[in-house]
């Protein structure tokens, strides 16, 4: 009968072993349940990702692996959807902005036409120092005749400006911007013969600028 006590001794050990085995069994069940939730979350996320471009989808699958320990089904896809939207929105915004920045600068110089000047061809008379001199070539009651005349004579650096004579509009054609009256007089010799025949006269630039303000 010496075998019986040994069986009796092993019984509790086996019972104890059963209890210890049960705990891992419960843990395994819990893990498999959690794994099921993770799988569901991953499937849900990959389902949502299928509508997105491939690049965000790869980001999301990486995120799904990170989220496996705590499967939060609702927030993970939303977090990844919003960057995809903003990333898509930004390029279109810049595409629309760039044409406007390209086309606005050329419009500015044309809109800033100087007051008082009717027509000019690169004239620096308006911005020249008051101590400089210019040549008055002609004057008339209409600006278009003076402009036509200046173009006909192929004048460079001319200005047709509006002033008043006896309270009525009067237009003057001046040309050139010279540092001294002597330089202006010498320039008369280089003018077309028809222009010289009108006997151009030297005028201080400050007088012309005063006329422009009238």
Swiss-Prot record:
Any one annotated GO CC term: plasma membrane
- Membrane topology label: Single-pass membrane protein
Family classification:
Belongs to the DamX family.
Q: Where in the cell is it found?
A: Cell inner membrane
Q: Which organism is it from?
A: Serratia marcescens
Gene that this sequence comes from: damX
Q: Know the name of this protein?
A: Cell division protein DamX
Main location group: membrane
Its transmembrane ranges are 44-65
Query: Which keywords fit this entry according to its UniProt record?
Result: Cell cycle, Cell division, Cell inner membrane, Cell membrane, Membrane, Transmembrane, Transmembrane helix
What segments bear the compositional bias annotation Polar residues?
1-14, 43-53
Location of the SPOR domain: 127-204
Query: From the UniProt record, which GO molecular function terms apply?
Result: peptidoglycan binding
Q: Which Gene Ontology terms describe the biological processes this protein takes part in?
A: cell division
The record's region (Disordered) falls at 1-133
Task: Give coiled-coil spans as residue ranges.
Answer: none
- Any one Pfam family here would be SPOR
Q: What is known of its domains?
A: The SPOR domain binds septal peptidoglycans and is required to target DamX to the septal ring.
């Amino acid at each position: 009968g010496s075998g019986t006590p040994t069986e009796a001794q092993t019984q509790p050990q086996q019972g104890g072993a059963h209890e210890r085995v049960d705990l891992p069994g419960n843990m395994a069940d819990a893990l498999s349940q959690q794994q099921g939730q993770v799988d569901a979350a991953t499937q849900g996320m990959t389902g949502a990702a299928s509508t997105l471009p491939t690049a965000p989808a790869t980001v999301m699958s990486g995120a799904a692996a990170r989220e496996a320990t705590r499967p939060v089904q609702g927030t993970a896809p939303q977090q990844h959807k919003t960057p995809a939207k903003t990333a898509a929105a930004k390029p279109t915004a810049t595409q629309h902005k760039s044409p406007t920045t390209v086309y606005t600068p050329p419009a500015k110089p044309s809109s800033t036409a100087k007051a008082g000047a009717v027509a000019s061809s690169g004239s620096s008379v308006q911005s020249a120092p008051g101590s400089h001199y210019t040549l008055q070539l002609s004057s008339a009651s209409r600006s278009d005749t003076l402009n036509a005349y200046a173009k006909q004579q192929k004048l460079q650096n001319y200005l047709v400006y509006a002033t008043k004579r006896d309270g009525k509009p009067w237009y003057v054609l001046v040309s050139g911007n010279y540092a001294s009256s002597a330089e202006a007089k010498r320039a008369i010799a280089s003018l077309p013969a028809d222009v010289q025949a009108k006997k151009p006269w030297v005028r201080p630039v400050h007088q012309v600028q005063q006329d422009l303000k009238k």
